[in-house]
Amino acid sequence: MPLTPTVQGFQWTLRGPDVETSPFGAPRAASHGVGRHQELRDPTVPGPTSSATNVSMVVSAGPWSGEKAEMNILEINKKSRPQLAENKQQFRNLKQKCLVTQVAYFLANRQNNYDYEDCKDLIKSMLRDERLLTEEKLAEELGQAEELRQYKVLVHSQERELTQLREKLQEGRDASRSLNQHLQALLTPDEPDNSQGRDLREQLAEGCRLAQHLVQKLSPENDDDEDEDVKVEEAEKVQELYAPREVQKAEEKEVPEDSLEECAITCSNSHHPCESNQPYGNTRITFEEDQVDSTLIDSSSHDEWLDAVCIIPENESDHEQEEEKGPVSPRNLQESEEEEAPQESWDEGDWTLSIPPDMSASYQSDRSTFHSVEEQQVGLALDIGRHWCDQVKKEDQEATSPRLSRELLDEKEPEVLQDSLDRFYSTPFEYLELPDLCQPYRSDFYSLQEQHLGLALDLDRMKKDQEEEEDQGPPCPRLSRELPEVVEPEDLQDSLDRWYSTPFSYPELPDSCQPYGSCFYSLEEEHVGFSLDVDEIEKYQEGEEDQKPPCPRLNEVLMEAEEPEVLQDSLDRCYSTTSTYFQLHASFQQYRSAFYSFEEQDVSLALDVDNRFFTLTVIRHHLAFQMGVIFPH
């Protein structure tokens, strides 16, 4: 079957033996004729599976168409050759493109495989690193959280400590502020003349000086090694202390004798003011007034004076028992004390002061100060007593009657009596218990008590009693101003008048208490004293002069055995008699009720009459002042 290639849409069919092929693949028709149909295959058209060009022509064999057909073939060949060349060139280009495409595909395929493996490894490594990094970050965060928790606990503890320190610091600041305020209120003077700080500094300086002086006096070698300069200084001090006393001696001559005799048997009581006069504070103590009370000291030996000073505190349990029993009369109280005390120490007990064991709470802060000041004042009292002792001895040389001297006491009195007298004379009185509310008047109350607590008995009347006792027997001592006077030598009488009838100096009132000066002076001059029933005592004395019995002592045994009813009534009346109410100054009216209540409730009198001693005991609560003066035979 002949091939029928198709070239550019034409189909040529070659039949017969006349068909020839040209060297270029073009068919050639036989000379004898060409067929009607020719098949030509374009050699430039590539086949799908072969690179050769087959041209088939179908030429119908005919005589008239041979030449024409040949010419057409040649023309076609000529026209087909450039096209064939173009097709070949396109084929080459397509082949090259196909090779390039295959190479690109291969390369792309290889590249994809390589990139995937590398990326996979890279991704795995990155994921592993990221997981490790995450774990490290988590561990680090946990460690930081733990450290933060520890730091938080430490911060809380430090904050608590800081809070406590702040509280302590605030407390310290408050305490410091209160201390500064207290010191400023204590030491800063509100007024030049009324300052607690100034008073305290003065008291401190005076206390130091008195303490040094007391140490010098109490030293054992003081009597042997005392310098002349010290003696001169003591003499100057005594002269300075008694300079105001000499001025008052001239003034006392104008005082009526009745007022002097009234002062001789009276004792001023320091009253306990009410708490309404509280908001003042002044603890100034007048040392000069304390020294005046000890001017009756009669001694020549320093050791004897040391033995004479005795301050015995009362037993607190005894006071509690007395309070449980209820109010006891002063005489019964004194009789119970006489039962407990031996007869040997009776005189010593009479002259011994009692210190109250139970003081008010407001006075506790000042108690040690008063006691120390009192102990320091004893030394000055010793010097004053020695000076007056020398003066008394000089007057005794000129006197013709018995005097209160150590020679007379050595001749007629036992040693116990002398020691008891010295103990009484040299013992300063205790300070009264005053609350802090009455500070501006404390020094004045003390000065009133310290100046007027004593008995200034007129010895000319005592001399008269002695003469009557020698003639008629030993009657009881007369305490009346109506006793007849005895002729005494002028020098003795003058000395006695100067000694015993001299009123004490008025207290130096501070500036804060000046409006009440007249009130205190009226207390001293007119209204303080004991109401003694003189008529009953005189009746009893007249009866005793007829019977001539010995003077009974007011102790438990003699009172029950020999005391008559008249004396008992007079003594009871004396015990129960209180002092006259005071006519207070108008500016001091608000404190009147306190003085009255104090006098009505707390003051009781005990009278102990003996042939040698007259004891006046003032009992206020648990504070008893016992005093005595010798009655010479």
Swiss-Prot record:
User: Which portions of this protein are annotated as coiled-coil regions?
Assistant: 127-186
Q: Does the keyword Cytoplasm apply?
A: yes
Q: List, for all copies, the residue spans of the domain called Olduvai.
A: 221-313, 314-402, 405-460, 461-552, 555-633
Region annotation (Disordered) ranges: 15-52, 316-370, 463-484
The GO cellular component terms are: cytoplasm
Quote the biased-composition stretches of kind Acidic residues, using this chain's numbering.
335-350
Tissue-wise expression: Expressed in testis and fetal heart, as well as in non small cell lung carcinoma and neuroblastoma cell line.
Q: Which UniProt keywords apply?
A: Coiled coil, Cytoplasm, Repeat
Bias (Basic and acidic residues): 316-326
Q: Where in the cell?
A: Cytoplasm
Its family remark reads: Belongs to the NBPF family.
Q: What else is known?
A: Encoded by one of the numerous copies of NBPF genes clustered in the p36, p12 and q21 region of the chromosome 1.
Quote the protein name from its UniProt record: NBPF family member NBPF3
